[in-house]
């Protein structure tokens, strides 16, 4: 979507307390920061802004996301390890879990979880949704954090009365 249209939509929905979900590749995040910061709505990063897991959680792109998340208007979906992984489901997406864990630990009130079902355009493998549920406790081991991730935060974002 062109930025001017994106901004117009954001301006229209702001009065309703709605939010914008952005799908962005991590390497494009830096150039979008001023634009995203200027939007009047909350902004939710889909798929953790697609970090390059090979660079680790200290990579420049993921650090940019973490810095943005310090501003309360930004939220993040801890979704799609199956799209980001290099090691795959056989290793419980262990290369993606540190990213999910870091977001959940640092921003427990502004992270969401989902399966990305029905997993459109998957090329490598079809994920097992049961396994995706099972790994929640690996990156959000505390019951209180799981409740925020799965219940409280979605309620706050989607039904922010």
Task: Walk through the language-model features, giving the residues of each.
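Generic anion/oxyanion-binding catalytic loop in active/binding sites
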Residues: 21, 121, 135
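Alpha-helix N-cap/helix-start motif
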Residues: 89, 122-125
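Mid-to-C-terminal alpha-helical segments outside catalytic/metal-binding sites
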Residues: 102, 107-110, 124-161
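Active-site glycine-centered loops adjacent to acidic/histidine catalytic or metal-binding residues
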Residues: 116
């Amino acid at each position: 979507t062109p930025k001017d249209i994106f901004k117009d939509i954001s301006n229209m929905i702001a009065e309703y307390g709605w939010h914008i979900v952005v799908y962005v590749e991590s390497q494009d995040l830096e150039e979008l920061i001023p634009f995203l910061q200027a939007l009047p709505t909350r902004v939710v990063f889909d798929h953790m802004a697609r970090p390059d897991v090979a660079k680790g959680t200290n990579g420049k792109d993921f650090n940019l996301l973490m810095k943005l998340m310090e501003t309360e208007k930004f939220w993040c979906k801890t979704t799609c390890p199956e799209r980001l992984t290099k090691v795959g489901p056989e290793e419980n997406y262990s290369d993606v879990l540190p990213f999910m864990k870091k977001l959940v630990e640092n921003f427990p009130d502004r992270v969401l979880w989902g399966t990305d079902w029905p997993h459109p355009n998957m090329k490598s493998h079809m994920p097992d949704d049961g396994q995706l549920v099972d790994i929640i406790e690996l990156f959000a081991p505390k019951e209180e954090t799981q409740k925020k991730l799965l219940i409280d935060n979605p309620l706050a974002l989607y039904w922010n009365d």
